[in-house]
Amino acid sequence: MKDLLKFLKAQTKTEEFDAIKIALASPDMIRSWSFGEVKKPETINYRTFKPERDGLFCARIFGPVKDYECLCGKYKRLKHRGVICEKCGVEVTQTKVRRERMGHIELASPTAHIWFLKSLPSRIGLLLDMPLRDIERVLYFESYVVIEGGMTNLERQQILTEEQYLDALEEFGDEFDAKMGAEAIQALLKSMDLEQECEQLREELNETNSETKRKKLTKRIKLLEAFVQSGNKPEWMILTVLPVLPPDLRPLVPLDGGRFATSDLNDLYRRVINRNNRLKRLLDLAAPDIIVRNEKRMLQEAVDALLDNGRRGRAITGSNKRPLKSLADMIKGKQGRFRQNLLGKRVDYSGRSVITVGPYLRLHQCGLPKKMALELFKPFIYGKLELRGLATTIKAAKKMVEREEAVVWDILDEVIREHPVLLNRAPTLHRLGIQAFEPVLIEGKAIQLHPLVCAAYNADFDGDQMAVHVPLTLEAQLEARALMMSTNNILSPANGEPIIVPSQDVVLGLYYMTRDCVNAKGEGMVLTGPKEAERLYRSGLASLHARVKVRITEYKKDANGELVAKTSLKDTTVGRAILWMIVPKGLPYSIVNQALGKKAISKMLNTCYRILGLKPTVIFADQIMYTGFTYAARSGASVGIDDMVIPEKKHEIISEAEAEVAEIQEQFQSGLVTAGERYNKVIDIWAAANDRVSKAMMDNLQTETVINRDGQEEKQVSFNSIYMMADSGARGSAAQIRQLAGMRGLMAKPDGSIIETPITANFREGLNVLQYFISTHGARKGLADTALKTANSGYLTRRLVDVAQDLVVTEDDCGTHEGIMMTPVIEGGDVKEPLRDRVLGRVTAEDVLKPGTANILVPRNTLLHEQWCDLLEENSVDAVKVRSVVSCDTDFGVCAHCYGRDLARGHIINKGEAIGVIAAQSIGEPGTQLTMRTFHIGGAASRAAAESSIQVKNKGSIKLSNVKSVVNSSGKLVITSRNTELKLIDEFGRTKESYKVPYGAVLAKGDGEQVAGGETVANWDPHTMPVITEVSGFVRFTDMIDGQTITRQTDELTGLSSLVVLDSAERTAGGKDLRPALKIVDAQGNDVLIPGTDMPAQYFLPGKAIVQLEDGVQISSGDTLARIPQESGGTKDITGGLPRVADLFEARRPKEPAILAEISGIVSFGKETKGKRRLVITPVDGSDPYEEMIPKWRQLNVFEGERVERGDVISDGPEAPHDILRLRGVHAVTRYIVNEVQDVYRLQGVKINDKHIEVIVRQMLRKATIVNAGSSDFLEGEQVEYSRVKIANRELEANGKVGATYSRDLLGITKASLATESFISAASFQETTRVLTEAAVAGKRDELRGLKENVIVGRLIPAGTGYAYHQDRMRRRAAGEAPAAPQVTAEDASASLAELLNAGLGGSDNE
């Protein structure tokens, strides 16, 4: 008995490990795993179904087919455990060893492992420094390779064809050694001296200067070093022994009818064994070389197919013409081992059903059909039945449950009480897609869901299904209750706004109840309180909308958090007074004293949560829902065809538009406008007409005229049902009402261009056939887009999760002083996002001072909550430096202070929170709401793009930044700098508006001057770019020779002549080297210097420039010397929506990126080549100039002799994020990506907190390239993990040595995921083969730091509740203790014993 218990204990021991290492397997290692050699290709005997001896399923090698029973049946039962039968050679043990015992095949000739050969870059090729083509020719017996040159003129590794080999044999005899096949490659690999080769390459690296050569050398050095360090031997990449997978992992199952279903691997192994045996026989017979060679090649191909079918040549197909699934196919792809079984497992104790509404449920409840509950909670019911003594055995209990006896239902009630279940709706796009509820038993077969959680699940009741899961263990139940309960998930983790918000009916009900109406029944009464209001309403003495005075008692929290009552008489309506009864104490009456729309209700819940906390909010939310449903039913709001009131003006608006279109058509026919202009104008006319119709319609719907108490007419907001639905935010929008009662407007063709004949009808009037046909385009495109969108959005989320999965909060404070400056987002005249929204929930990086003083307003390291933000607003602070994850100094993970507030909970984030996954989900989840298309700008939009002035909206003072300007003759400022910004500051010092001012703009007001709202402050010519002089004097032409560098043109209409500079391509040979320029001289003819420098004022003119001055004219500063016509870029496509977000996160270079200045200095142009010009920037301090070739067609923003700063734009275009990082730093690139991504989401009205995007950016910046190795052991130009450089530098500096210098790299999310330190995580993401090959060669260790790796190896993840377990293990490891072993109690042991004995009895009781 005792040793049985010991045996059981050994069975339950869990493996504790800290890291997983992957390496090449040596032949001896493969043999040590093996339990015997597989010699025959046979599988099982088709008559007896017993495995053949020495075959692929041999019981002697792999273990018994039945538990504790040998093959011939001599030994049965547990007592013979461990005996090896002398007759059949099978060990008596459990069958499950057939899942773990491996075999092997001794190959008669070595074969190359295809992964190390063909997975690019080829490892064997890199190691031998031979091209892959040559190696393949040797391996597949087409050429010879020289292994030892001896005293001959043949080089080692030289490739010889058959003829060359024979010639060499004749010439040198056996002086040299050349072979073909894998033996040759193996010999080459064996004879390599890795250390010496490494030394040699390092020396070469120091001597060489060519960039490509350096890259190649570093690659080889890295590979060789990896081999040296990992202890892998190169010749192990050639297989001499092939391992055989355990048979139960490649099963063979008999189907009825004498056929077998088998895993493809068996076929592949059979081919290998057959060819191997044939090759052995041929070698024993000493067959002719050519036959042996052919057989060897076939063996090589068979092994290739087994390891990775289809990688080389055609894939081997089975009987049914489809390629066989090889070992590589087993692990890669969506159906492979990683994604199908390790990352996505199926679970027991779950059910699914359709969902319906449960309007009477509380927020933490869900309705569970009795049938489902009975099935899901079976084990608990069996247990209870036995415990009560109502059933003696499990079998009896089972029978009772099947009969559904009365007592079973009582027990079910008991079991279910306080036992939460998880509800999940696919697709689970964010963590709120799985929440816990307490089940309430219901009749029927549909799960009932609380209406308020629909928003989080994105569920509706048109046939959606949901899955139920039962948390079994106590810990699981505890987590479900404490963390996943729907009542604990009130706020969205993406933006910190409430996600439990009413929608549709509830909103309509509350809106209806809080509206007021002129002269309603009971207007003007004075009531004692909400109770009386309700009584009057119920008894029909007062209308719900009557304006009355009511005595209201409000409660307000004082400084100590006590509630203080305050009673006053309020002007309000009956409905609002009734609603006040459900509002929790502590909120002001003003929040219900308004017509409540969806936004107002959301704000009300948010306020409630911030002031009163979780519990009152949950109760309040439920009450809101019940009240809303009640009054929505009372309102009787419905949609009738007469609610869609068509405006009378519609006909005349349309006929006016038609007349204008006809007029333009005439102009087009008489040749006054071009076809494109006509099209754009027509579309503009119809768009304007549509707007007018919809405005007339909305004015019509919005108000109605009523008679008030005094008998006068008064306008009030309409009670039209459709209008109320749209106005409250319950359903529908102005655009949809426009289609119902206005006109449908312009439609797009399938290719996205707009059809110029609009649909003038609306749905109430009905469409004719043509109109209906046109409108089908749009509908069809919508459906197609949605399908594409879902797939793309899902893939984006997967990439985001993958790149961010290992980012966890690991410490409280990293102590950094770095951070990013937060300012409000202002585009033109509107504040898109106020500062408050951007800094709320962040931690300050430095003290915030009161503007204009040195007094500290907010100290450093303060978490900015609502009250702090109010303080910032009161003092009109305009910029705050906050901590950010991008600048966090924690090595693995981030610190809580750099992250700030946990948006879903409202306090600073806890340690162990998986912020990476939360960020990825928050960005990915709204992905399906983004559009898929690229926007074409045409018509009205493209004309608006060419702005030519700035008109301010508000009054205030002007502030210019980065400005250089000169005053012109009329006393106005002319801008001569490139990236000038004009800001409007209000009287409190806050920025209200911000505009970009181009070069050459004329300002009406100067810096610091006051302007009134609506005033124009700057204007410029959008079509030409001027050349402005900064000094006054006389113009002197240099190199301006008519016919060579310039030509004179006269305008027919005005008769004015102007000079046009010829492009270098148009010039004659003599004019090629001339540089046309305008020089400014004083009256004496001496050069005038540019103020502040010693350079003469000389303006070089580029080709196509137009000069309207004559030689020797007097000019004054600020005048235009020449104009350069700007080719307007035509209609540019703007990539929007999802593709744009993907481009940003993948850090793709745009097609024609902006050219930025690499260094600061003076611009000049060097010698031109055919299609390019040479830009030279000479630094002022006299160091080496920087040169760059720029295509001629790029329009440059700089003139010769101008001074630029590093990172300035030289030629416009979309900026490449890599350039921003290189030239302007980490913070600039963070700001760029965050702002660009936010622009896309903001357009769709989706709110995402900046810090989620910053988290992804931090992961994109994980790598750094070593610039100078210092005394570290990195290679120059090597790409390493940023944290590793930091740690290494810290150690070096502590020892007083020189650290490595590096430059940060920006990787796209796919690249970053594949470049992670963890090979398990990378392999499960994409390109499994390549990742595993690389890892094996380098002998990588996976420290299992991220979440994905731990899920794959089946451990608790180092986040959330698993964080403590991992911390504990790390502490133990540091202290060197053994991990706490799981204790086996006596009960456990006896239970396991019973199970084991049952197994030994051959399972007589197998129901």
From Swiss-Prot:
<keyword id="KW-0808">Transferase</keyword>
<dbReference type="InterPro" id="IPR007083">
    <property type="entry name" value="RNA_pol_Rpb1_4"/>
</dbReference>
<dbReference type="Pfam" id="PF04997">
    <property type="entry name" value="RNA_pol_Rpb1_1"/>
</dbReference>
<dbReference type="GO" id="GO:0008270">
    <property type="term" value="F:zinc ion binding"/>
</dbReference>
<feature type="binding site">
    <location>
        <position position="88"/>
    </location>
    <ligand>
        <name>Zn(2+) 1</name>
    </ligand>
</feature>
<feature type="binding site">
    <location>
        <position position="895"/>
    </location>
    <ligand>
        <name>Zn(2+) 2</name>
    </ligand>
</feature>
<dbReference type="InterPro" id="IPR012754">
    <property type="entry name" value="DNA-dir_RpoC_beta_prime_bact"/>
</dbReference>
<comment type="subunit">
    <text>The RNAP catalytic core consists of 2 alpha, 1 beta, 1 beta' and 1 omega subunit. When a sigma factor is associated with the core the holoenzyme is formed, which can initiate transcription.</text>
</comment>
<dbReference type="InterPro" id="IPR007080">
    <property type="entry name" value="RNA_pol_Rpb1_1"/>
</dbReference>
<keyword id="KW-0479">Metal-binding</keyword>
<keyword id="KW-0548">Nucleotidyltransferase</keyword>
<dbReference type="InterPro" id="IPR045867">
    <property type="entry name" value="DNA-dir_RpoC_beta_prime"/>
</dbReference>
<comment type="similarity">
    <text>Belongs to the RNA polymerase beta' chain family.</text>
</comment>
<feature type="binding site">
    <location>
        <position position="460"/>
    </location>
    <ligand>
        <name>Mg(2+)</name>
    </ligand>
</feature>
<dbReference type="Pfam" id="PF04983">
    <property type="entry name" value="RNA_pol_Rpb1_3"/>
</dbReference>
<keyword id="KW-0862">Zinc</keyword>
<dbReference type="InterPro" id="IPR042102">
    <property type="entry name" value="RNA_pol_Rpb1_3_sf"/>
</dbReference>
<keyword id="KW-0804">Transcription</keyword>
<keyword id="KW-0240">DNA-directed RNA polymerase</keyword>
<dbReference type="InterPro" id="IPR044893">
    <property type="entry name" value="RNA_pol_Rpb1_clamp_domain"/>
</dbReference>
<dbReference type="GO" id="GO:0000428">
    <property type="term" value="C:DNA-directed RNA polymerase complex"/>
</dbReference>
<dbReference type="Pfam" id="PF00623">
    <property type="entry name" value="RNA_pol_Rpb1_2"/>
</dbReference>
<dbReference type="GO" id="GO:0003899">
    <property type="term" value="F:DNA-directed RNA polymerase activity"/>
</dbReference>
<dbReference type="Pfam" id="PF04998">
    <property type="entry name" value="RNA_pol_Rpb1_5"/>
</dbReference>
<comment type="function">
    <text>DNA-dependent RNA polymerase catalyzes the transcription of DNA into RNA using the four ribonucleoside triphosphates as substrates.</text>
</comment>
<dbReference type="InterPro" id="IPR000722">
    <property type="entry name" value="RNA_pol_asu"/>
</dbReference>
<dbReference type="GO" id="GO:0003677">
    <property type="term" value="F:DNA binding"/>
</dbReference>
<protein>
    <recommendedName>
        <fullName>DNA-directed RNA polymerase subunit beta'</fullName>
        <ecNumber>2.7.7.6</ecNumber>
    </recommendedName>
</protein>
<feature type="binding site">
    <location>
        <position position="70"/>
    </location>
    <ligand>
        <name>Zn(2+) 1</name>
    </ligand>
</feature>
<feature type="binding site">
    <location>
        <position position="85"/>
    </location>
    <ligand>
        <name>Zn(2+) 1</name>
    </ligand>
</feature>
<feature type="binding site">
    <location>
        <position position="898"/>
    </location>
    <ligand>
        <name>Zn(2+) 2</name>
    </ligand>
</feature>
<keyword id="KW-0007">Acetylation</keyword>
<dbReference type="GO" id="GO:0000287">
    <property type="term" value="F:magnesium ion binding"/>
</dbReference>
<feature type="binding site">
    <location>
        <position position="72"/>
    </location>
    <ligand>
        <name>Zn(2+) 1</name>
    </ligand>
</feature>
<dbReference type="Pfam" id="PF05000">
    <property type="entry name" value="RNA_pol_Rpb1_4"/>
</dbReference>
<feature type="binding site">
    <location>
        <position position="888"/>
    </location>
    <ligand>
        <name>Zn(2+) 2</name>
    </ligand>
</feature>
<feature type="binding site">
    <location>
        <position position="464"/>
    </location>
    <ligand>
        <name>Mg(2+)</name>
    </ligand>
</feature>
<keyword id="KW-0460">Magnesium</keyword>
<dbReference type="InterPro" id="IPR038120">
    <property type="entry name" value="Rpb1_funnel_sf"/>
</dbReference>
<feature type="modified residue" description="N6-acetyllysine">
    <location>
        <position position="972"/>
    </location>
</feature>
<dbReference type="InterPro" id="IPR007081">
    <property type="entry name" value="RNA_pol_Rpb1_5"/>
</dbReference>
<dbReference type="InterPro" id="IPR007066">
    <property type="entry name" value="RNA_pol_Rpb1_3"/>
</dbReference>
